[in-house]
């Protein structure tokens, strides 16, 4: 058996169902499960998707938000069991696959144009 076939069999049950189809530039709300000692809570992180890395079960996406004038970026594993759900707040119109230029912009210049639905 080839290594790719073995990996495919191992990774198959790890894929999550019900993940919305979001793209770079979309504003998303990620509900992330945090375990603190014996307690467990859900933390919501809302921001613009800067990049997506599509690699099967190892897929990731980076979300950026501005909190109290400080930019905060967080990288999430798409198929992680710690992600409770991902909601799409609004669709954005961008012409790039990576939005790293938003890091250098502030205020209204850092906004992404909304898609006309």
From Swiss-Prot:
Gene Ontology CC terms: cytosolic large ribosomal subunit
Keywords: Ribonucleoprotein, Ribosomal protein
MF GO annotations: structural constituent of ribosome
One biological process term in Gene Ontology: translation
Highest taxon of the lineage: Bacteria
SUPFAM superfamilies the UniProt entry points to: Translation proteins SH3-like domain
InterPro entries per record: Ribosomal_bL19, Ribosomal_bL19_CS, Ribosomal_bL19_sf, Translation_prot_SH3-like_sf
Pfam families in UniProt: Ribosomal_L19
Family statement: Belongs to the bacterial ribosomal protein bL19 family.
Physiological role: This protein is located at the 30S-50S ribosomal subunit interface and may play a role in the structure and function of the aminoacyl-tRNA binding site.
NCBIfam families named among the record's database cross-references: rplS_bact
HAMAP family: Ribosomal_bL19
Protein name, as recorded: Large ribosomal subunit protein bL19
Species name: Sorangium cellulosum (strain So ce56) (Polyangium cellulosum (strain So ce56))
Gene: rplS
